[in-house]
Curated annotation (Swiss-Prot):
Protein name as catalogued: Homeobox protein 12
Any single GO CC term annotated in Swiss-Prot or TrEMBL for this entry: nucleus
Source taxonomy: Eukaryota, Amoebozoa, Evosea, Eumycetozoa, Dictyostelia
Source organism of the structure: Dictyostelium discoideum (Social amoeba)
Domain of life: Eukaryota
Residue spans of biased composition, Low complexity class: 78-94, 160-170, 237-249, 289-301, 309-321, 331-352, 394-443, 458-482, 559-569
Length: 846
């Protein structure tokens, strides 16, 4: 018997309890690599093994799984690929010794030297050619022979253990009980004192009891796996002869709830009627660290527990044992011809990346993840690494069940839908209705994207449903409606319906042209107001859709329900999201808007609103304003003031107030005031020009995207608003300067009066001011007087301007705040007296 292996591995077991042949690689002087074939030899546990020469490698980090890489000169006893190998430093190994007698099958307690070997990952060779990566198992006990670990025996109980002397002669009889290793030697042992490594010490580092019966059970399990096959691959000829069929179910998948206890479980595909025990591994390294102890306590010998032949399942909590559900494996394959369907089964399984054979499923060994462990991203390998954390991406891919309905000479793979023609009345285009495909899963998933689009699922019964399952009757009804609506626009590009190639449902451009043509027809009918003709055309189109499938009758109730839910009837390939009646809805909305506008034009209230808005805009553009355009400040309108100009200068006010600039003190103050005032005016004008430029740029950008929303009158009103706002700011600055200059006027008059008394009378009479001049009031010129008089006449019913109006009036006619208020108060008093006199004349009162 020959076997093909992809990794440098070997396996020892007893074939006495197996009725089937199995590909086992044993001790060989040449080894095997790649695809080399090697004759296998079955040996027992008590047979002598050859001693390999260890190969030195680097020391692995703490908490990592260990594996020993051996040379090919001797026996490769470690089950594991070289790609996933981590080794310990090179240590001189002693010649191997024969294993103990069959009466003493239990492992003696050992103390590990600084080589921190705790466990190994291994790989199991199978006879499946499609197996691209190894299946991970725990390292079996006899594999410790080839490990580069130094093991020393503990001293007798009467001898105290110390850090300086910890070596005991190798002739010490082994105890009858194996205990977990918790004491690590801190000093190196001379090579001469290193004892022989026992065959069955591998599981001692994991804390298990071990016997020969357990090894035989493992071998028997391995034989059953190879004999029964996976139900999909090369084992179709044998798997029906035995009830122990394996189809990896979701119930035996790795449970996330075990993370919180820090324990992993070996997920062996064990049948329900099998007596092979399930072995829990040691506490997961890295999840829960043991409690720290002092160095003296760690060096104390551990007490010997009672003998125990089976794995220590009793020591675990009962709730933790219940979390590990019993594995139930079902083979849902209906093979009508087991001799002729091997190729068909392999092809169907290879087409769907989520049909994973049982033997290609990696088994969780419960050890820390190896950095070079295979990833689930490669779907060609069709395995799942339970060491990797389960995420949404790989968990959905795991939950796919291996349920195929394989018939004679039938290559249709229902997991990958090939016949998607909606107008094809072939009955083969149906979902897989396998009655055995009913599994209780925690999360519902679809087989692939096409099944999700068509609403086909695995018919899983679960409490938390991710997607709403559609019944078979609703699916048929939707398919019938879809065919009636889209068969005219369907273009079959797949050729043969049974070829299995995917097709393109239809061309989106052609669909758009059909909608566009229908839209034009609807517009022509709307212009003529022929609603009856539109209904007749729609009925004709429905008749055409009925005739496309050869159906003479059509269910009107289903058609009405479809018309009410046309927005949800989207095309299945997700290439177009526009409903069938999308353009019809738009035309109806446009028609309703036109009717509303036509109704508003006849309404008198609507006409009044239009006229009022038109007049409101003309108020800002019909009259000249300050700087040719003043506009509004906020919602206030100052256009009625009829400002022609606003000169931002203080010279006119200084001249009219007759301020004497010959005084050095007054002159210095005026010059300083002018400097600050001119700086503020320049800053305000710059800001105004920037605002106007921004408004112009925004208008230009808006016209490139759409038609201008504002006409010339609206744009002019916006400009007036900007001009009026900054003009008001300048007016405030000018009035504040007037107030400062007005306070300097008495000082100027006093200086002129005192200066005339000091100097000659000629100078005083010629250029100075007399005492009478100091008391004289300022009179306005004709221009300013006519302006303020007109404003007062226009507002005679309420001659009390607001603050903004007062500021602008003061800036226009060069009056300070005090002079302006005085003028308005005097004007109102004179007007009041004048009205009283006129009233007395009318009534004849003397």
């Amino acid at each position: 018997m020959t076997s093909t292996a992809n990794n440098n591995t070997s396996f020892y077991c007893n074939n006495n309890n197996s009725n089937n042949n199995i590909n086992i690689n044993c001790c060989s002087n040449t080894g095997h690599n790649g695809n080399n074939t090697t004759e296998t030899t079955l040996t027992t546990v008590n047979e002598e093994r050859c001693a390999p020469t260890p190969t030195p490698t680097s020391t692995p980090p703490h908490g990592s799984a260990l594996n020993i890489q051996n040379s090919n000169n001797g026996c490769n006893n470690i089950i594991g690929s070289s790609s996933n190998t981590l080794s310990t430093p090179s240590v001189q190994a002693t010649p191997p010794t024969p294993p103990p007698s069959s009466s003493s099958l239990l492992v003696q307690p050992m103390i590990v030297t600084p080589s921190p070997v705790v466990a190994t990952t291994s790989s199991l060779i199978t006879n499946d050619d499609n197996l691209n990566s190894s299946t991970n198992y725990l390292m079996l006990p006899h594999q410790a022979q080839s490990s580069a670990m130094t093991i020393v025996q503990p001293p007798p109980p009467s001898t105290p253990l110390s850090s300086s002397s910890t070596v005991v002669p190798a002739s010490t009889p082994p105890p009858s009980v194996m205990t977990p290793i918790t004491t690590i030697q801190t000093t190196a042992t001379p090579p001469s004192l290193q004892p022989t490594i026992h065959h069955q010490t591998a599981l001692s580092f994991l804390g298990y009891t071990y016997n020969e019966q357990y090894q035989q059970n493992i071998c028997q399990l391995y034989h059953q796996l190879n004999a029964n096959g996976n139900g999909n691959g090369n084992g179709n000829g044998n798997h029906n002869n035995n009830n122990n069929n394996y189809n990896y179910n979701n119930n035996s998948f790795y449970q996330h709830q075990q993370h919180q206890h820090g324990l992993y479980y070996n997920q062996f595909p064990i049948p329900m009627n099998s007596s092979v025990p399930i072995i829990p591994t040691q506490q997961y390294i890295g999840t829960k660290q043991p409690q720290s102890q002092s160095q003296s306590q760690q060096l104390q010998p551990q007490p010997q527990p009672q003998p125990q032949l089976q794995p220590q399942l009793q020591s675990q909590p009962q709730s933790q044992q219940l979390k590990r559900k019993e594995a139930s494996y079902h083979n849902n394959n209906n093979n009508n011809n087991n001799n002729n369907n091997n190729n068909n089964n392999n092809n169907n399984n290879n087409n769907n990346p989520y049909n994973r054979p049982t033997k290609k499923i990696m088994v969780s060994q419960g050890l820390p993840p190896i950095s070079s462990s295979p990833s689930f991203q490669n779907l060609n390998n069709k395995y799942f690494d339970f060491n990797q954390p389960i995420t949404r991406n790989n968990y959905n891919q795991v939950n796919y069940n291996n349920n195929n309905n394989n018939n004679n000479n039938n290559n249709n793979n229902y997991n990958n839908i090939s016949n998607n023609n909606p107008c094809n009345n072939n009955n083969n285009n149906k979902p897989n209705n396998n009655p055995n495909n009913n599994n209780s899963n925690s999360n519902k998933t679809y087989i692939n994207k096409q099944h999700r689009d068509y609403g086909y699922e695995n018919n899983n019964n679960n409490n938390n449903k991710t997607f709403q399952q559609t019944s078979q009757q609703q699916q048929q009804q939707q398919q019938q409606i879809y065919k009636k609506q889209n068969c005219n626009n369907y273009i079959d590009e797949s050729g043969d319906d049974e070829s299995g190639e995917e097709y393109q449902n239809y061309q989106p451009y052609q669909q758009y042209q059909n909608f566009k043509q229908n839209n034009k027809d609807n517009n022509n009918n709307d212009d003529d107001d022929d609603d009856d003709d539109d209904e007749e055309e729609e009925e004709e189109e429905e008749d055409d859709n009925d005739n496309c499938n050869g159906n003479d009758s059509y269910d009107e109730e289903n058609n009405n329900n479809n018309n009410n839910n046309n927005n949800n009837n989207q095309f299945k390939n997700e290439s177009i999201i526009i409903g069938d009646n999308y353009y019809e809805i738009i035309n109806d909305r446009i028609k309703s808007i036109k009717q509303k506008l036509h109704f508003l034009e006849k309404n008198s209230k609507f006409q009044w609103i239009r006229e009022k808005s038109f007049n409101f805009i003309n108020e800002f553009t019909g009259e000249s304003v300050v700087n040719e355009e003043l506009g509004i400040r906020g919602s206030k309108d100052f256009s009625y003031l009829k400002y022609k100009t606003l000169n931002p200068s203080l010279d006119n006010y200084i001249t009219q107030e007759r301020i004497e600039l010959k005084n050095p003190l007054i002159k210095a103050n005026i010059e300083k005031l002018k400097k600050d005032f001119n700086f503020e005016i320049t800053k305000i004008n710059t800001t105004k020009s920037e605002s106007l430029e921004i408004m112009k740029s925004i208008q230009q950008l808006s016209t490139t995207v759409r038609s201008p929303l504002l006409d010339r009158s609206d744009l002019k009103a916006q400009r007036n608003h900007i001009h009026g706002f900054f003009t008001l700011i300048i007016a405030h600055q000018k009035c504040l300067s007037f107030d400062f200059i007005y306070q300097m006027r008495p000082q100027s008059m006093d200086h002129q009066h005192g200066f005339s008394n000091t100097f000659t009378d000629d100078f005083t009479n010629g250029g100075g001011c007399s005492i009478s001049d100091k008391k004289n009031r300022r009179t306005l010129n004709d221009q300013y007087k006519s302006f303020i008089s007109d404003y007062f006449k226009n507002h005679s019913d309420h001659p009390y301007p607001n603050e903004d109006e007062k500021i602008i009036i003061s800036a226009l006619i060069d009056l300070s705040k005090y002079q302006r208020n005085n003028w308005f108060s005097n004007k109102r008093s004179r007007e009041k007296n004048q009205r009283i006199v006129n009233l007395k004349k009318q009534i004849g009162f003397h």
